[in-house]
Curated annotation (Swiss-Prot):
NCBIfam families: DNA_YbaB_EbfC. This is Nucleoid-associated protein KPN78578_04440. The keyword Coiled coil does not apply. Homodimer. GO terms for cellular component: bacterial nucleoid; cytosol. One of its GO terms (molecular function) is DNA binding. Keywords: Cytoplasm, DNA-binding. It is found in: Cytoplasm, Nucleoid.
Length: 110
């Protein structure tokens, strides 16, 4: 099934290497900062890889406008930042498993 003992041992070695790479990648992702925008850049929200809000920037012109619109723009900017960090996480995690010769449908135990 795995090409003999060497095949299984090699597979386990690959799994361990992948686990180490994924742990390192998760640490790197936690340090990332991504900025989401709404209202053509009038509202900007910066979050880190753990989805913690680090900074909110609001163009002064919005402070004179409708409070409800401003709240919607802040929420939209946060959602944009969250989407961007998710995309970045997927890309980085995909790069960790690239090149590994795993059987189709193989699930990592971590």
């Amino acid at each position: 099934m795995f090409g003999g003992k060497g095949g299984l041992g090699n597979l386990m070695k690959q799994a361990q290497q992948m686990q180490e790479k994924m742990q390192k990648m998760q640490e790197e992702i936690a340090q990332l900062e991504v900025t989401g925008e709404s209202g053509a850049g009038l509202v900007k929200v910066t979050i880190n890889g753990a989805h913690n809000c680090r900074r909110v920037e609001i163009d002064p012109s919005l402070l004179e406008d409708d409070k409800e619109m401003l709240e919607d723009l802040v929420a939209a900017a946060f959602n944009d930042a969250a989407r961007r960090i998710e995309e970045t996480q997927k890309e980085k995690m995909a790069s960790v498993s690239a090149g590994m010769q795993l059987p189709p449908g193989f699930k990592m135990p971590f």
